[in-house]
Regions:
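Terminal and domain-boundary accessory regions
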Residues: 1-199
């Protein structure tokens, strides 16, 4: 993996929603988040690893929200692996046309929050590892490289990674190229727990 060749302090930023959709679309098996973090850090010193999630609030007929148990389990396991978890609720907007037809839209991403955290930590790290394929990070990556002297690496699913992000990052690793990242068998709840906190 290219990222393990660099030395110094490394900070890892995991865009949970982007990662979830990548797993769902392109890979089979249960992702081992401990292996993911170990691969991102390599032989370097971990400064911080942050996992960003969006919690889905699903209500049943009684109005009670579901998925809380899965979300707590998922966050607990991430903490055990060494991640700091930041979460926000999925915001649901309902609008009605003049004819009374309802349209439901969802908003819940961490792009701006992740970029802000990257800026805050820039003077303390040597390398950033971004686990996301989202092109919205390109300008932030360019700034961190040119103005802060940071090495920025990306781990993502290549088929759904922005070409601009691939072009600008210092190294890229496809999720499928990380040894033992996906278990063919194991607790079936793992992906379900991830599903309960991202959309």
């Amino acid at each position: 993996m290219g990222s393990s060749n660099a030395v110094g302090k490394v900070a890892v930023f995991v865009d949970g929603a982007n990662l979830y959709h990548s797993i769902k679309s392109y890979y089979k098996g249960v992702l081992d988040y401990g292996v993911l973090l170990a691969a991102a850090v390599g032989d370097r010193k971990l400064l911080r690893a942050t996992f960003y999630i969006v919690e889905k609030q699903e209500a049943d007929d009684s109005g009670a929200t579901g998925g809380a148990t899965g979300a707590r389990s998922f966050v607990y396991n991430l903490n055990k692996f060494g991640y700091k978890v930041r979460s926000k609720p999925l915001v649901v907007h309902e609008t009605f046309s003049p004819e009374g037809e309802k349209t439901v839209s969802h908003k819940g991403d961490w792009d701006i929050g992740i970029i802000v955290d990257m800026m805050r930590l820039a003077d303390r790290a040597d390398t950033y590892v971004l686990v996301s394929g989202d092109g919205d990070y390109v300008e932030a990556v360019e700034y961190l490289q040119s103005e802060k002297g940071l090495r920025v690496e990306v781990i993502s699913a290549t088929p759904c990674t922005s070409q601009a992000l691939l072009d600008v990052c210092d190294a890229h690793t496809d999720l499928g190229d990380i040894p033992d990242l996906f278990r063919r068998s194991g607790p079936s709840r793992a992906l379900g727990d991830h599903q309960s906190v991202v959309s």
